[in-house]
Amino acid sequence: MHSWERLAVLVLLGAAACAAPPRGRILGGREAEAHARPYMASVQLNGAHLCGGVLVAEQWVLSAAHCLEDAADGKVQVLLGAHSLSQPEPSKRLYDVLRAVPHPDSQPDTIDHDLLLLQLSEKATLGPAVRPLPWQRVDRDVAPGTLCDVAGWGIVNHAGRRPDSLQHVLLPVLDRATCNRRTHHDGAITERLMCAESNRRDSCKGDSGGPLVCGGVLEGVVTSGSRVCGNRKKPGIYTRVASYAAWIDSVLA
């Protein structure tokens, strides 16, 4: 059995007493309009927010593979229809995870292939506050300067404050050549990855696995790589979903 498969089994069977800290790295953003992003998911470990996610089909949520690294002994669930993580909302529902499918080439020590598909225990109840997001299938780069939306429940300042309500920020896409400069990510950004500017506004810890949405279409997923949030020389890194269209389709089939 593949190591990721063993991990996924442990995730679904275990139940730990405490939750792991949120993974990933919205900084400098603002509170989102309630339920205006019905595709948003909170991937939770033992009842606490761990990572972002995006509903891509009635029974499937896309997130980041690295999110499971801290989850081997815990119970993973997915919260849909939420704006506030703690307050009661008619649209909120917590789903168990039937199957966790990390990309087969994902590895703990690299940001490449950092994708994870979570099959919900049943099809989500769709409505105005819960709806899948169309995702990009055409494998082409988003034009530099395009403003894209990132949303999540990740930390909102360098002191580590975690929001209860969904936050979002608009970020311009950065060209790959600039992102690969020695002073930035020094050649690490492959054609399967993309960058967005991070000058005091950025995705941050707890946002990993969340969506980068450009023109109403899912273009990228926040990676879990470790870096300083909001540093303009360390732009945000996102996995391009179009590069993995065949894999996503094969899992969802």
UniProtKB/Swiss-Prot annotation:
Instruction: Spell out the molecular function terms from Gene Ontology.
Output: serine-type endopeptidase activity; serine-type peptidase activity
Function noted in UniProt: Serine protease that initiates the alternative pathway of the complement system, a cascade of proteins that leads to phagocytosis and breakdown of pathogens and signaling that strengthens the adaptive immune system. In contrast to other complement pathways (classical, lectin and GZMK) that are directly activated by pathogens or antigen-antibody complexes, the alternative complement pathway is initiated by the spontaneous hydrolysis of complement C3.
Return the protein name: Complement factor D
Listed Pfam families: Trypsin
Species name for this entry? Homo sapiens (Human)
Localisation: Secreted
Q: What is the effect of changing S208A?
A: Abolished serine endopeptidase activity
Which keywords belong to this entry? Answer: Complement alternate pathway, Disease variant, Disulfide bond, Hydrolase, Immunity, Innate immunity, Protease, Secreted, Serine protease, Signal, Zymogen
- Which cellular component, as a GO term, is one annotated location? extracellular region
Record PANTHER family: COMPLEMENT FACTOR D, KALLIKREIN-RELATED
CDD domains attached here? Tryp_SPc (cd00190)
Peptidase S1 domain sequence ranges: 26-253
Catalytic activity from the UniProt record: Selective cleavage of Arg-|-Lys bond in complement factor B when in complex with complement subcomponent C3b or with cobra venom factor
Main localisation, per the record?
secreted
Q: Which residues form the propeptide?
A: 21-25
PTM comment: CFD is activated by the removal of 5 residues at the N-terminus, named activation peptide, by the MASP-3 isoform of MASP1.
> What residue range is the signal peptide?
1-20
- The UniProt record lists the EC number as 3.4.21.46
